[in-house]
Amino acid sequence: MEIKEIIPNLNRTVIYNDSEYTLTGSTVRKDVQGRIFYQAELLDKNKNSVCIVRLEDVKCLNL
């Protein structure tokens, strides 16, 4: 997923590791070398848990 795809996909189904999740948020962080990176907050509908993953690893579900 790209940064520009975050807002249109909030609270929508996305794919991560070949499973469906709900994108519930995104976080911007800075690593120790000063590089900016994004994380996605994904809700696992089956286990009712939240996963924090690399934004690049999330795919939009194109309906």
Give the location of each predicted region:
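Exposed regions on extracellular, virion, or secretory-pathway luminal proteins
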Residues: 1-3, 45-48
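Structural motif
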Residues: 16-17
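Mixed-charge, Lys/Arg-rich low-complexity intrinsically disordered regions
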Residues: 1-12
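Short beta-strand-centered aromatic/proline hotspots
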Residues: 20-30
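Short aromatic-glycine-enriched beta-strand elements
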Residues: 35-40
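Intrinsically disordered, low-complexity, charged/polar segments
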Residues: 46-63
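A short local loop/turn or secondary-structure capping micro-motif enriched for an aromatic residue
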Residues: 30-33, 60-61
